[in-house]
Amino acid sequence: MTEPTSSTPADEEGAPASLPGRQASLSGRHGASRTPLADAVLAVARRDIASFHALPLSHGRSIRDSRVRESYEALFGAAQLAADVSYSGTMLDSFFRPRGPLREAQRLAAAGFGADATFFLSTGTSTANRVALTALARPGSRVLADRSCHQSVHFALGALGVDVTYAPMQRCCADCPRTFGDLPRLLQTFRTAVAEGRPYDTVVLSAVSYDGVRYDLPTVLAELAAAHPKVAVLVDEAWGAVHRFHPQLRPLTALHAVEHLRRTGGPLPLAVAVTHSAHKSMSALRQGSYLHLVGDGEARERTAQALFQHHTTSPSWPVLASLDLARLQAETEGEQLLERSLNLARTLRAELGGDPRLSAYRALGPEGHLTDPALLVSDDPTRVLVDISALGITAADFRRILFDDYGLYVARESGDAVLFHVHIGVDEATLLRLLEALRTIQRTYRTASAALTQGTSDHFIIAYPPGIPITVPGERLCDRTLGEIGALRSSGCEIYTLQQPGTSTATYGVPSGPAVPTTTDTRPPATVSATQAHSPTTSAPAPPPAPTARVTPATIGAPAPSRIPATPISAAPAGASAAPAIPAGRK
């Protein structure tokens, strides 16, 4: 083992985290109740310290008489401005050679996650991946990389001067758009290289995907180490930091797998680095990241040197302090919070599968997908991938509607599916809000889609302005009609679809083709439905002449400088819906 030298950014006194023996003394009840770094940052934030160094903004000093002060305080608050400081060394701690509260916080994190060492980063897991690869993969060495890895891995490998082989990806199935690394082929490639006398020195795995695919790391790490014990492994678990803290999710995590191999006496890789985007699944500020390490002193020394090379010399102390707080919350409350997330994700799947008002949505997995143990993968049960193709609108438009009209954000779309991440910040009220939004969107858009795809309309389809029906009940739809609706939508018109209220009998002429038979509408008069509790009520434009119901449309594509927030449906009559037109040709 090579000990750190005096020129190393993290020498023995300033090592980023403790050895396992020292961890044990800090990881019990006493350690679980402490947040040393957060406490230290809070202490300096509460003092009236005037800086002659940097950060004029600290404590809001540079904006006290500024016209932008109100906006600053509205965005950040006085506490955030006070906590964003540039102190280092003994005044707070050294980021690259920690000896005080940062060192202690990193020791507690290493104990909590089960690592030999943990580094805090305030520049995200892209930086953590670069640091880890710089430490593990020497120039000229051979690297076997999971093709599904984050871009930061690919860019880092390209800059390191290593010989890279990419293991291929595979698709979940024809019905599900998720992709992931082909782990059986990766392992076979690795074993073949060992047999040929040209083993890979480093393996990179993307073990928890954005789309909710988790790798069987106990099996993968054991097979890699059995074939070549001198291999180093980087495991990117960016989306699974919190999984450590729930018994259902913990078994597949990298650090738990290493603990299991140690307990059972199985072969271990030479070094294992694990990167966690704490802000993705824990209560940490954005760009807060953990880099965990299992290995000897040389691995820790090389990691500390790489951190010095790649991390900013102006770390964010609020971000670092949030990593300390997030660790404590995960240790003391994580299991309870994750249990709620798992239950809510199950509820969402059950509602989508059993509520006829949500029949336009179809949850993809976990049942029936990724169930082949030979794939060495499984579903992340906190992710719900939902097919929305039956709505007749694109996934991109669906995301925009959720955001603009309901204040709900979904980041991921894949084909006709969108991904809901039921993380620990989603509670029962948030899920109910989502379900109500989904029901309203189904009433609105599925009606419009059906009206546009059937041969004969049983609705009024009206563009406003000018309020003149494009089609009336009983009128035949043709490609020209669909094209006209698409053009009006693109120009910013609001498109309404409304059923005829009351009881009526009418015969409508058709411009071309045979006459349309008489249609009789025996539906009862329309009734008014309640507006969603979370949506403000706004007035609709003057209704078109034929229907008497008042509706407020949900508009796609129209200029909307005042839509903050907009209302999707306000006091809409039963049997009526207000919807943007569906692009021509889409079902």
Regions found by a protein language model. Give the residues of each.
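Long, low-complexity, intrinsically disordered segments
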Residues: 1-3, 8, 535-587
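Long, compositionally biased low-complexity repeat segments characteristic
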Residues: 5-13, 17, 510-542, 548
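Conserved C-terminal alpha-helix-loop-beta "cap" of PLP-dependent enzymes
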Residues: 312, 346-504
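Conserved active-site and cofactor/substrate-binding residues in soluble primary-metabolism enzymes
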Residues: 32, 36, 96, 100, ...
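Conserved PLP-enzyme active-site core in the AAT-like
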Residues: 125-353
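N-terminal "arm"/small-domain region of PLP-dependent enzymes with the aminotransferase-like
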Residues: 2-99, 231, 464-466, 472, ...
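Charged, glycine/proline-rich intrinsically disordered loops and linkers
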Residues: 66-83, 245-270, 366-371
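Conserved N-terminal alpha-helix of the aminotransferase class I/II PLP-enzyme fold
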Residues: 80-127
